Amino acid sequence: MKKVGCITFHSAHNYGSVLQAYALQEFVKLNFPDVVYKIINLRTKRQKELYSVFPKRASYRYKFFVLFNYFSLRKKHENFEKFINTKLELTEEFSDENITEERFDFDYYISGGDQCWNIDCADFSWLYYLTFVKKARKLSYSISLGPKALSASNLMVEKIKNCVNSYTCLSLREIESINQLSKILDKPMQQNIDPVLLLDKDIWTKLAGERIEKSAYIFLYILDNDRQAYDFATRLSKYTGKKVIISKPICKKDFFHHFTNRFDCGPVEFLNYILYADIVISTSFHGCVFASLFEKPLITLNAEKDNRRWCFLEKYGLANRNVKPNINDKEIEVLLDTVDFTLFKNELKREQNRSFEYLKNALGED
């Protein structure tokens, strides 16, 4: 049996981060039965503080918001921790101070996916470059440097180069990351799909469980303070007569809307609200991906300003799901018609096969 350890943002209380960690784990377990797979349970002080219910470095505005919604946000924290500790195959917990290669007996180490190599991430650590591993084989899967990684100081660029040079196989999430690394490193690299796309609809459906919300609804999932998305959701709610459910607090607006708050939403609940929604509005990459996996009527706004989201929509034949906020009622009606996901499913199967072949080669499978 081969032993594989994966290091990733598995404990970030972020839907995409936790679910991509789960997806890569399950894909390897399903396709490589001779592999014992564990996620290295790195819990840095910075990451724990960042995702605590009451972050010390948060603004006074956000702290007031937390007080106002404390019980929901505490439940959300509990839901994330429950998922991390029951659904992920973890090693014992390590901090940035006590993690060493001698504590493990892995034959292979994987970095990825997510933005683990993005030095601008608030919870970044050089440990995600597997700096503590000196002997075993290292590879990456669908990892990202983020958009600005190599615009850092020459010292940082040199450190990234030295770290990545020790990897035997390199798979990155975005072409931009490949282009950046190719400027400083002469090694073969390939682009692979985000881990959440590795698993088929039926696996995610089973994880999502029985329907939580009994009435019809629109699910709105956005990452930032997006007035246009809020206004569009309000308009669509009036047009369809369906309520809007939101899972993510955006404090400047959360006191002034008539949406249904579900701020206690953990990873499983997030999947559930997308799966059973009548319509999904999202400006998030993972929101768009899961809506597509569940074959829901997806609406996204201004995706052309977000390269990652736009490339996904174009690649999978879903560019027509991207709209301007001021579209007329006739255009809205077209959006609510049945969506053709044939191209998406065909292209996805090809990409899943590419990822399988990459991992088979990287893990030395016959």
Question: Model-predicted segments: where are they?
Answer:
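Active-site anion-handling motifs in enzyme catalytic cores
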Residues: M1-D366
